[in-house]
Amino acid sequence: MRIVTDNKIVGFTAGNFDLLHPGYIYTFETAKQHCDWFVVFLQKDPSLHRKSKYKPVIPLYERYKTLMSIQHIDEVFIYQTEEELLNLISIIKPDVRILGEDYLGKSFTGDDLPIEVIYTTRSHGWSTTKIKDLITKQTIEQNPNILNDGEEI
C-alpha cells in the first residue's frame, strides 16, 4: 500500500521536530529535490526511550500543524517507538530516506531496508539541542536567582 500513485518517488525523514528552525527548512527543501511526495514521520517524545534526548517543548499537535504548513511537506504521520516507525515505513513503502550527514557510518532504524539514503548537510549550524541549551544559559545568566527561588546568593 502506498499513499500516492506508483509513478511518484516517495521520500521521508523522521524526528520529533521540536522548535522548528531554519536547518529543518533546508533539510525539507533538499528532501523535496529528491522526491515527488515528501513524508515526515513525527515522533511523539524521544525522551521516553532515549534518556539522552530532551522532552519536546512544543506539544505534539502544534508540531504536527507546523509541519503540515510547510510547502515542502506533503504528509505527516505520528509514531512513538522505533517499531512503529518500521511499521510506517513498511506501509508507506518509500523510495528515498533523508538523513542528516551526522548519521553517516552509523546504524539507524531501517538501515537494512532497500531504500536509497540521501544525507543532507548540517553545515548550516542549526540544532534544536543547541537552541534549547542557549535559551537555558541566557535565562540563567539574565536571572541569576532563578534557581534559588528568588533568594540572594
Feature locations, PLM:
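Nucleotidyltransferase catalytic core that binds NTPs
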Residues: 1-153
